[in-house]
């Protein structure tokens, strides 16, 4: 196994003051990219997740620098020293006005690339937000057998990335899943689920249940399989893209040790580990240091392989 890379993204979204006024939305079907600026000269990725920017602009929100000058959001990020953006993509968010669908992703990725910024694509594999408390299958994927679920993951991944390629955008990183501490693509049937541990009925069924007692069984083998077909789909389109497996609670050494030991044991593939930390919501109490313990432990382990 090649040496593992590690990445901790502290996405500091440095939005300035908003003011409401009309604004034209960028056409996602616009032509190819103009000449790009050279990427910012640095080996350190300093980025922000600004996936909501097109929706904000559509609602008339504007962005300003510290001098009060109205500035394009992407340009503002670059002016603040950022050299990368993370952009999420959902499968079919029609109930959310199609924000963060493939076309919207391409629109934003082109704007970032035009400024010489690196792009990370964040696949949620859901029709809306996926996180440890909700890893719901896209509506169109419900009822699929395991083989067809894998094909759906691979097909969606490749389709989105091919759309970026057609637009002249080459992502540097691709996340296969978002905050998948609890797995992805949950199902009541453990044979079809990608849960990493047993999940409550109220989480699997969402608003259709309030039961916290019934738990649906984990299937880490399926989770590894879903990650792997996503990984392979990424490499089939962008062979040099860095594939990230992303968890939250970056301070939790035991979580990362358990998760990636299980993923390795089930044949999982990844190039980089993505860690999220949320100081605003988390009482760190020096936990920021423990996130380094896993990276140190795992790096030592990889060096010994």
What are these regions (language model features)?
Residues 17-38:
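Bacterial Sec-dependent N-terminal signal peptides
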Residues 34-70:
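Boundary/entry segment of secreted carbohydrate-active catalytic domains
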Residues 59, 132-133, 186-189, 251-266:
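Distinct, well-ordered alpha-helical segments
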Residues 63-77, 157-160, 254-263:
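Short, acidic/polar
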Residues 76-199, 215-219, 224-234:
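Substrate-binding cleft and catalytic face of glycoside hydrolase catalytic domains
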Residues 172-178, 227-254, 304:
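Aromatic-lined carbohydrate-recognition surfaces of secreted/lumenal glycan-active proteins
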Residues 258-287:
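Aromatic- and acid-rich polysaccharide-binding/catalytic face
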Residues 294-305:
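Single conserved hydrophobic/aromatic residue that forms the stacking wall/gate
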